[in-house]
């Protein structure tokens, strides 16, 4: 995942939300930052956000932290920030065999109780 850029899709509206870029530290731990907002009305400031991020730019914001490779195309043990709700969730990722899609899963407690989003690789 290191260096790759992904288009996030809102699971409620099925519309593109942002581009995020993954990076990896020297220990192999991944994080991801928002590189671009794809919703024109939210490009400069997040008017839909609550709390900390209301009316602030989200460009450069680290939304994924501490994601670790746990097997072929599988990453887990991370966290993801939802700036709109100002909440942080546990986070895991499974990359498709062709490397073009990933299933992002955010959850509280156990993974069985959570939500999936499909993100698409940007070349």
List PLM regions with ranges:
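Hydrophobic core segments of beta-strands in well-ordered, beta-rich domains
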Residues: 33, 104-105
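Edge beta-strand at a domain terminus
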Residues: 99-101, 107-123
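Central antiparallel beta-sheet cores of small beta-barrel/beta-sandwich binding domains
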Residues: 3, 8-91
């Amino acid at each position: 995942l290191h260096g790759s850029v992904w288009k996030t899709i809102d699971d409620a509206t099925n519309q593109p939300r942002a581009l995020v870029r993954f990076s990896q530290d020297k220990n192999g731990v991944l994080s991801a930052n928002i590189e671009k907002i794809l919703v024109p009305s939210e490009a400069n400031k997040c008017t839909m956000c609550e709390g900390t991020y209301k009316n602030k730019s989200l460009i450069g914001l680290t939304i994924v932290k501490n994601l670790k490779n746990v097997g072929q195309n599988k990453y887990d043990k991370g966290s993801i920030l939802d700036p709109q709700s100002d909440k942080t969730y546990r986070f895991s990722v499974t990359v498709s065999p062709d490397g073009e899609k990933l299933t992002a899963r955010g959850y509280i407690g156990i993974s069985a109780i959570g939500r999936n989003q499909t993100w698409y690789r940007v070349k």
